[in-house]
């Protein structure tokens, strides 16, 4: 449905070249929800703007539903964009128009008659849960309701693709989840392909079938959500997965943490479990095998793409040789171990 082939994008500041995208290759299958995640400045917003040619790639091709957008005239591109809906972080609603009229705008511009507009807008407002808000104005809506209006407007032209540019980042957690559930429902009911960008791994975990991780304008890693969470190959992927779990080191431990091991101190470790390692009794195994005591300070477990993953912060109480052997045993069994320091 969407093919991004060897796409590069260069911006210029005077004589300075800024490479926002570097040789990006992605294939997004029809009917999937595909996430692109990256930190601020990673290039993800530039990428999604290239997909509907709001930004023209410096080189490479963008193919949507078999049509190479980079080869179209302005008139052809304008017509083709009707197959591509887009929603934004800040909604972009017209404050002087009612909810009904905001959703009707693309239909008016397409020359639809009043009867067609009435029928389509009523159907869409029902779909997004705003059937009772026809005559309301944006100023009287919550953030979540405004985004629902924006989604309805984006669907007015019956697009085959819906682009979501940080669509939930301005919303509170509960509202974010309700918007994600709505997007899942739209994907299921309308069979529409959804490409969304985000800086939050929780969004990817909640809604996406596949994900690409972007850093410094480059494609770092891609795969199904289950694959990425079960077998992250890069440190950036580990960082994003870690961000979905709430693990904090108690303040009294932080002040006692030493960078090197001294007499009377013990290692504080962060353990990352993915896939099969989550269910394996590895912690009890190292306790028995190496005769060490283990104090668990915090732990968290979650699911994504049908895969369990979890993290744990623990203190190991043994002699230095046994502690090191236990850490090596965990690593040999595909647990990522980070020694955070030594607690005195």
Swiss-Prot record:
GO cellular component, one term: plasma membrane
Keywords for the protein's UniProt record, in alphabetical order: Amino-acid transport, ATP-binding, Cell inner membrane, Cell membrane, Membrane, Nucleotide-binding, Translocase, Transport
EC annotation from Swiss-Prot or TrEMBL: 7.4.2.11
PROSITE patterns, per the entry: ABC_TRANSPORTER_1, ABC_TRANSPORTER_2, METN
Pfam family of the protein (one): NIL
Segment forming the signal sequence: none
MF terms (GO), sorted A to Z: ABC-type D-methionine transporter activity; ATP binding; ATP hydrolysis activity
Enzyme class, broadest EC rank: translocase
Source taxon at top rank: Bacteria
Compartment(s) of residence: Cell inner membrane
Domain ABC transporter positions: 2-241
Catalytic activity: L-methionine(out) + ATP + H2O = L-methionine(in) + ADP + phosphate + H(+); D-methionine(out) + ATP + H2O = D-methionine(in) + ADP + phosphate + H(+)
Binding site for ATP: 38-45
Main location: membrane
Ubl conjugation listed as a keyword: no
Membrane topology listed for this record: Peripheral membrane protein
InterPro entries on file: AAA+_ATPase (IPR003593), ABC_MetN_proteobac (IPR012692), ABC_transporter-like_ATP-bd (IPR003439), ABC_transporter-like_CS (IPR017871), ACT-like_dom_sf (IPR045865), MetN_ABC (IPR041701), MetN_ABC_transporter-like (IPR050086), NIL_domain (IPR018449)
General function of this protein: Part of the ABC transporter complex MetNIQ involved in methionine import. Responsible for energy coupling to the transport system.
Family, per entry: Belongs to the ABC transporter superfamily. Methionine importer (TC 3.A.1.24) family.
Protein name, entry field: Methionine import ATP-binding protein MetN
Organism: Vibrio vulnificus (strain CMCP6)
Gene name for this UniProt entry: metN
């Amino acid at each position: 449905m969407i093919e991004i082939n060897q796409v590069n994008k260069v911006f210029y500041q005077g004589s300075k070249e800024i490479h926002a995208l570097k040789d990006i290759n992605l294939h997004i299958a029809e009917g999937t929800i595909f996430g692109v995640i990256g930190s601020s400045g990673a290039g993800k917003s530039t990428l999604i703007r290239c997909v509907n040619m709001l930004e023209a790639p410096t080189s490479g091709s963008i193919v949507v539903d078999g049509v190479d957008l980079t080869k179209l005239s302005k008139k052809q591109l304008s017509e083709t964009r009707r197959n591509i809906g887009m929603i934004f972080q800040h909604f972009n609603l017209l404050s002087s128009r009612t909810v009904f009229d905001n959703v009707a705008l693309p239909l008016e511009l397409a020359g639809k008659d009043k009867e067609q507009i009435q029928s389509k807008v009523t159907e869409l407002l029902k779909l997004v849960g705003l059937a009772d808000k026809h005559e309301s104005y944006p100023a009287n809506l919550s953030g979540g309701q405004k985004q629902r209006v924006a989604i309805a407007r984006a669907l007015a032209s019956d697009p085959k693709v819906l682009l979501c540019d940080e669509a939930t980042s301005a919303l509170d957690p509960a509202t974010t989840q309700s918007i994600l559930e709505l997007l899942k429902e739209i994907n299921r009911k309308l069979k529409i392909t959804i490409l969304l960008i985000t800086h939050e791994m929780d969004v990817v975990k909640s809604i996406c079938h596949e994900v690409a991780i972007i850093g410094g304008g480059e494609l770092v890693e891609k795969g199904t959500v289950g694959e990425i969470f079960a077998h992250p190959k890069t440190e950036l992927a580990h960082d994003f997965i870690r961000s979905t779990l709430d693990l904090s080191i108690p303040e009294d431990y932080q002040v006692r943490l030493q960078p090197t091991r001294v007499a009377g101190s013990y290692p504080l470790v962060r353990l990352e479990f993915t896939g099969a390692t989550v269910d394996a009794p590895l912690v009890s195994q190292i306790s028995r095998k190496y005769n060490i005591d283990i104090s668990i300070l915090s732990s968290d477990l979650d699911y994504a793409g049908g895969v369990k993953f979890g993290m744990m912060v623990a203190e190991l109480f043994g002699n230095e040789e046994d502690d090191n052997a236990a850490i090596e045993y965990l690593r040999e069994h595909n647990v990522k171990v980070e020694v955070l320091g030594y607690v005195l």
